[in-house]
Amino acid sequence: FSVKQKDKIKNLAEKYEYQVVTFRLIGDLEVLFKRSQKRDLDPKRHLSHLVSRYHKGDVLEDRSKADCLVTYDIFMDRCKNRGYGTFELGHLIEVDVTDFSKIDYPALIKELCDLVEE
C-alpha cells in the first residue's frame, strides 16, 4: 500500500475495531524487477494485468507484446517514489524478500501470533 490508501485503511480499522499489521516487503530492486518480469510473462498470469483493454476470452500468445508491461524505469519509479518503503499502519514487520530461502517463516508467524494474542 501507499499513502493513497492509508486513511481508508485506518478508518476501516477504527470502524470495525481490528488490529492492523503492516508487512513491508523489501529487497534488491534488480531481483524484484526480474521476478516481476518473469511473473508478467508467465502464461498463467491473467492477461488483464498486462493489457490496457481486455475482453473475456482474449488471448495473447506472445506476452512480450502486451501493451501494459511494466518497464524497468516504471518499476523503479513506482518502488522509489510511491511511498511503499515508508507506508506503516499499526505494527510494522519488515521482510527482505530478495531470496525467499533466507526468510525465517517460523519467526514471522510467531511474531504475528504474539501480536494477535496481545
Over which residues does each language-model region extend?
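Conserved nucleotide-sensing/catalytic segment adjacent to the nucleotide-binding pocket
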Residues: 1-11
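Short glycine-/acidic-enriched loop or helix-start segments at secondary-structure transitions
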Residues: 5-6, 34, 105
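Conserved nucleotide-binding/hydrolysis micro-motifs of P-loop NTPases
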Residues: 1, 26-32, 99-101
